[in-house]
Amino acid sequence: MHGLTNVEGEGVVLKLEDNEEQQITSNHLLKLVNDLKYAGAEAISINENRITNFTDIVDVNYVIMINGIKISSPYEVKAIGNQTYLSSTLNAKDGFLKTYKETGVTITMSEEKNIKILKYNRELKLKYGSSNY
């Protein structure tokens, strides 16, 4: 999941919205990203921010930040991969949809044939490593 190229293909699109009873947090999005990776997603984006192996998803003063970029509800999560695997993993007994729909969060999911996810458009910075060897 380096995210260095634009990709397109089949997959799923989820829309998540806060409501008066439940606010979506970085933990919700991290669980969703992990479930999608487990299901074999080849590319993932949240509100058009490409998810890579280096992506940070954190809460800062009740605001979700992805790699230092503020995002807000509604959240659109796109995942490219085998639709059957993605859908069945998210709908499994302990999957994201079953777990979080019970909390009152508004979630919809659709299977789509032609999803486009743009490449990661920022510089990848390594703290301890170097690509100049």
Identify the residue ranges that each predicted region occupies.
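Core subunits and conserved enzymes of cellular information-processing
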Residues: M1-Y133
